Amino acid sequence: MPQSQGTGPGVITPDGCAVDFYAMLPDFGEPAIVHEAAGSGAAILELGCGAGRVTHPLIALGHPVVAVDESPEMLAYVRDAETVCARIQDLALGRRFGAVLLASHLINTDDETRRVFLEACRRHVADDGCVIIQQHSPEWFATATDSEVTRDGLILRLRDVTRPAPNLISATAEYVAGDQRWTQTFTTTRLDEAELAAALAAAGLRLDRYLTEDRSWLRAVPVIGSG
């Protein structure tokens, strides 16, 4: 599983996310990208939905959403969607969807976790559907450094950035809302194009196209007969 841990008030999920802070976060443009890639009205399976910051705008755009997260505390914030409390790798709904969403850089993890996450995507995507994936961009891996962003009164800091190996970045995300403060320490793994293609192929998927100029979002499609 991803190497991460969190601190701060309230519930912290197994992967280090602070439920109270994630419930405050707005979207950062993700729903528009997903909507364009999935197609109007497509049913979406959202893996790792958190507190619904992307779920709710997708529903507003006309998508039926099944929202999956391992944290019941996160799912308690999700409205107007079918919710499933499960780990991604254990998910077996027996249904296929027009689009499966794997956001939040969940693909930038260790090889085994990436494999089981992509296999979950493949067994739930329709043959004529797509898998929409968010990854850390190549540029981010090359340039990531300590930084700070403020959005809607919330402060998001990245600090203690190190590169323990050529393909790894370790850092601490610090989140501040008023007098509350949380941290999430994590390690993330870079994928080059060949590694990405190989990971997709192993799961019965192939790259269709990149969705953003920086290649942080991509659309994959099933290899017919593979799942």
At which residue positions do the language-model features occur?
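A short acidic, Gly/Pro-enriched loop at the edge of an enzyme's catalytic core
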Residues: 92-100
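A short glycine-rich, Lys/Arg-flanked "PGG" loop and its adjoining helix->strand segment in the class I
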Residues: 115-127
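C-terminal lobe and adjacent flexible extensions of AdoMet/dcAdoMet transferase-like proteins
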Residues: 195, 199-227
